[in-house]
Amino acid sequence: MAEMNPAQGHVVFEDVAIYFSQEEWGHLDEAQRLLYRDVMLENLALLSSLGCCHGAEDEEAPLEPGVSVGVSQVMAPKPCLSTQNTQPCETCSSLLKDILRLAEHDGTHPEQGLYTCPAHLHQHQKEQIREKLSRGDGGRPTFVKNHRVHMAGKTFLCSECGKAFSHKHKLSDHQKIHTGERTYKCSKCGILFMERSTLNRHQRTHTGERPYECNECGKAFLCKSHLVRHQTIHSGERPYECSECGKLFMWSSTLITHQRVHTGKRPYGCSECGKFFKCNSNLFRHYRIHTGKRSYGCSECGKFFMERSTLSRHQRVHTGERPYECNECGKFFSLKSVLIQHQRVHTGERPYECSECGKAFLTKSHLICHQTVHTAAKQCSECGKFFRYNSTLLRHQKVHTG
């Protein structure tokens, strides 16, 4: 082994030590702390045998968790550096009082290859630390990364499915999938959620916060996944094809929902009335019928609505906004559904046909009104007069009620 170059200087404990923050230390169990202590003691012993640190001065100093300022404050449990257990020499079987004296004794064996070059010693120390901390004996996990000690092992196991988690709170959130527990309640509408992060995203529907903005069109979204899905609109990509009808979709979730049109599957059931829905969002909207919650209030007239989209449409009454334009005649409409109905004037389309007489209509409401012609006439209970339409009967009855 080459002699040490004086220009390179001594290797000190700080060069090869690994330190914890207070938070990291708190994540280690007793076995992991003892393992860390053993490795640091070996590092110190090797340096002591080279005369690179003063073991006698620090020998009895306790190893405290905290910010390291030297050899005596390695981040480890409180036992003293000097251990009372005898240490056997692997070369000659001699018993030494402690690990420091064993290191000094090892130097008496010329065949022992001591590192006098700081670079060689530093590399040896890193390899030794990796080997110690990554070995599988005793179930000790690997927790060295970037010359610091971290818990990379996932030590919290779900007893139901065996999935492992690195933090206890993540395991707790996961276990709610098995129990169905929903502990996070929205203070505005009362809906319950399994995870706090899901509740936080939901609450943005009440506050109006939309932190994720598309850099193409400026449209903002409640959560990042919605932004990612939206951005495929600009690329035009539709990679998901329905095997039944060949229709293409931008997102796999939309394809899955669409395929329920063919299968008739409605997996989302209301616990209140037993009604089933094709997608979860429809169930959430329906559930508000039972809760009676109307969380979205109009700042102009004070009227409340169950959904933000309904509030947005209502507010056009006050603003006069008509964002939907007919490309045939240039007429504007406040609702897209009204524009679609209007466009049938230009196309001649009449999609709603009477099953009795075959007459077709522009809108479903017109068809329903027409179908009363084929049903029994409506009779006034007061005077016995008959009417074709229920609406006409109701107007007539006001004559009797005043």
From Swiss-Prot:
Subcellular location: Nucleus
One cellular component term from this protein's GO annotations in UniProt: nucleus
Taxonomy, superkingdom: Eukaryota
GO molecular-function term, one example from the UniProt record: zinc ion binding
Keyword Disulfide bond: no
GO biological processes: regulation of transcription by RNA polymerase II
Keywords: DNA-binding, Metal-binding, Nucleus, Repeat, Transcription, Transcription regulation, Zinc, Zinc-finger
Pfam families given in the database record: KRAB (PF01352), zf-C2H2 (PF00096), zf-H2C2_2 (PF13465)
Zinc finger (C2H2-type): 87-109, 156-178, 184-206, 212-234, 240-262, 268-290, 296-318, 324-346, 352-374, 378-400
Annotated CDD domains: KRAB_A-box (cd07765)
Domain (KRAB): residue spans on this chain: 11-82
Predominant location category: nucleus
Membrane spanning residue stretches: none
Family: Belongs to the krueppel C2H2-type zinc-finger protein family.
Function comment: May be involved in transcriptional regulation.
Protein name (database record): Zinc finger protein 547
Gene behind this protein: ZNF547
